[in-house]
Amino acid sequence: DAVLGNEESAKYVTGIAFHGYENDGFDDFSGGLEYVTENYGKDVYITEITEYSASIDFASNISYSLQNVVINPLNYGLKAGTYWNFVLTSDGQPVLGNTAECYGVINLDLESDGWHYSKNASYYAMAHVSKFVYDIDGKDAVRLGTESSNTNIIATSFYRADGAVVVIVHNISDVSYEAVDVVIGDRQFTYEIQPQSVVTIVC
């Protein structure tokens, strides 16, 4: 409030970034994201949130990304989210000046027959949005209000300039399949989502 609530200083601010450290996530930032967007109309960003070596497997990692960088923050007006690093080795190297054991979006490893790359869970979490949500003829996609009555299901959706509606749905449960009823205006259909899985629907 000290900066954004002052008319003179606020005109020099285009956005506010919420920076993540160990164990930080969407729950730590949701109040701030909502407060800034609703009271000041400034862009909001999440920086350096990423899965790390304490995670169990690919499913838990993609779930972490979808909950903390992609779906939940987008519903709170997120302008952009960034990960810890774009390219690292599969064991999180190089580490400069700290002891973080974080993953890059891409792994790049030198093996006996040369360099090899692989994609981490965060790559696919981003791809569920970036592959389907884009501008058309200079017209940006518009985020739609999206609600879920199931606590295991989180979702966000966009209206594209070509008239398509893009819905990204994630089942956060690590044990149960969830049948999701998707309702868009007068259209409705049901889709069953596996545990800790994500689906992007274009209709």
PLM feature spans:
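Composition- and surface-driven signal marking solvent-exposed, interaction-prone regions
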Residues: 30-32, 58-60, 140-141, 179-185, ...
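Aromatic/acidic polysaccharide-binding cleft in carbohydrate-active enzymes
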Residues: 46-128, 143-146
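Flexible loop/turn segments at secondary-structure boundaries
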Residues: 23-26, 52-56, 88-94, 174-177, ...
